[in-house]
Amino acid sequence: MATTADFKNGLVLVIDGQLWTIIGFQHVKPGKGPAFVRTKLKNVLSGKVVDKTYNAGVKVDTATVDRRDTTYLYRDGANFVFMDSQDYEQHPLPESLVGDTARFLLEGMSVQVAFHNGVPLYVELPVTVELEVTHTEPGLQGDRSSAGTKPATLETGAQINVPLFINTGDKLKVDSRDGSYLGRVNV
């Protein structure tokens, strides 16, 4: 059990028998009336996002989630195989569980897998990943008044928009949450 004062991003709540992760929250103390907490919750299994408001100080059920360091090994048909870094046990996870994070998964990458009662829930990538550009068109400078972007294909097959000066073979830092370009990696 936890109270609204314990809310933080990533906390997993049990609501109506389902697991929900807090992805955003705001404590509100209006001039008139009691304080409350607005939360944005994401269903762990379905990915559905809902807004829910709690009165301040309310107790809520929390789930114990074990986040384990793993290494992504390979893809086997519809499954992604991860190896636990402590006991070297391999966990094949279905594509539905890996979700959108699959577009930035590279063999040998260290990621975290969240477990609840021994059942894998979801995969967490590092916030920034370093990937190489495998294909992009040459950028033409000077034909626009502001900085432009162009599409680029990364070594995982994901496509992102990058500045015009990026070339094939460059290694980039990419935000794994939204796929945005963060910068070049100095080699």
From Swiss-Prot:
Keyword hit for Cell wall biogenesis/degradation: no
Alphabetical list of InterPro entries matching this protein: Elong-fact-P_C, NA-bd_OB-fold, Rib_uL2_dom2, Transl_elong_fac_P/YeiP, Transl_elong_KOW-like, Transl_elong_P/YeiP_cen, Transl_elong_P/YeiP_CS, Transl_elongation_fac_P
Chief localization: cytoplasm
Pfam family, one: Elong-fact-P_C
GO biological process: peptide biosynthetic process
MF GO annotations: translation elongation factor activity
Pathway, per record: Protein biosynthesis; polypeptide chain elongation
UniProt subcellular location: Cytoplasm
GO cellular component terms given for this protein: cytoplasm
CDD domains: S1_EF-P_repeat_1, S1_EF-P_repeat_2
Keywords: Cytoplasm, Elongation factor, Protein biosynthesis
SMART domains documented for this protein: EFP, Elong-fact-P_C
Disulfide pairings: none
Family recorded in the similarity comment: Belongs to the elongation factor P family.
General function of this protein: Involved in peptide bond synthesis. Stimulates efficient translation and peptide-bond synthesis on native or reconstituted 70S ribosomes in vitro. Probably functions indirectly by altering the affinity of the ribosome for aminoacyl-tRNA, thus increasing their reactivity as acceptors for peptidyl transferase.
Record protein name field: Elongation factor P
Upper classification of the organism: Bacteria, Bacillati, Actinomycetota, Actinomycetes, Mycobacteriales
